[in-house]
Amino acid sequence: MAGVTPQLIKELREMTGAGMMDCKNALNETNGDLDKAVQALREAGLGKAAKKAGNVAAEGLISVLVNSDNTKAVLLELNSQTDFVAKNENFVNLTKEITTHALNNGIADAQTLASSKINGEEFQTYLNEKIATIGENLVARKLSLVSGQVVNGYVHATGRVGVVLAATCNDAVKDKAAALLRNIAMHASAMKPTVISYKDLDPAFVESENKAIRAEIEAENDELRRLGKPQKRIPEFVSKSQLTDEAIAAAKARFEDELKAQGKPEKIWANIIPGQIERFIADNTQLDGRFALLSQPYVMDDKKTVEQAIAEVDSSIVITEYIRFELGEGIEKKEEDFAAEVAKQMGK
């Protein structure tokens, strides 16, 4: 078996919450492939949806800057080596200066930033001077420039998460749309959607999660059954992308058959079936609520979705772009081999 180490087992446990032996077996079955082991556990109903936060190891700050008329915004991730430096006033000011430079000069990404000039000198020369002053290696790792009819953003007070959104709308409601986008950006910083709409979800991902979510609920039902508590419905689907007209029609026909079998008068079916259809859709779109921004319960009022909250402000508002940075996302932890490091330093 390739690469099945105690460290890997520990990491899989932290990612999924599954038991040690279950994690070990899953890694053995997948030849040490962490991602495949996570999916194997989920499909067996043994692990929760994994977040790859365990692989994140970076310090620094996320910065968001929006221009005065809410038509452009820059999102920047500036990394340092330690949290101590990230809280340093010089580092905070540096982050603001780079973000302002990017916004004022229409710099769209980190590569363009690296080749730009700031305060009359090459960006890397400028950054090297700051490195010498601050005393740690610094990296402007990610940068995005967002433009649109209306744009707004939010950065969490800790500087570890930032979100920028763009939308189209009627000119008359632009100010309302800008205020709404800030609130939705705040929502997205906490709820971590990966796409704007369920329509943006990859079909292969939907199919994979269909099995995994069913397995999760079946595992929960085993425990509820043991405790003598009501069990959850097992969904047929997990996303609106799977809910064809035929699927909804089949559900409606099934509800009609059930009401008929229960002896309910046909004249009251019209009062009952719409609620059943609504519940059917909610039960069968759980994936959308996890990953699609518009389908998520709105944190400002969880009785409505983000999509419904937008419609209440004005039906002309349409979100067209969504970018979320989380500090260190995608950076792998460095595994230290202290024996090898000592041997290297001793020239062995």
UniProtKB/Swiss-Prot annotation:
InterPro entries: EF-Ts_dimer_sf (IPR036402), Transl_elong_EFTs/EF1B (IPR001816), Transl_elong_EFTs/EF1B_dimer (IPR014039), Transl_elong_Ts_CS (IPR018101), UBA-like_sf (IPR009060). It holds the Pfam family EF_TS. GO terms for cellular component: cytoplasm. It is found in: Cytoplasm. The keyword Ubl conjugation does not apply. Residues 82-85 are annotated as: Involved in Mg(2+) ion dislocation from EF-Tu. GO terms for molecular function: translation elongation factor activity. The keyword Cytoplasm applies. Its main location: cytoplasm. Keywords: Cytoplasm, Elongation factor, Protein biosynthesis. Transmembrane segments: none annotated. PANTHER family: ELONGATION FACTOR TS, ELONGATION FACTOR TS, MITOCHONDRIAL. Belongs to the EF-Ts family. Associates with the EF-Tu.GDP complex and induces the exchange of GDP to GTP. It remains bound to the aminoacyl-tRNA.EF-Tu.GTP complex up to the GTP hydrolysis stage on the ribosome. This is Elongation factor Ts. It comes from Aliarcobacter butzleri (strain RM4018) (Arcobacter butzleri).
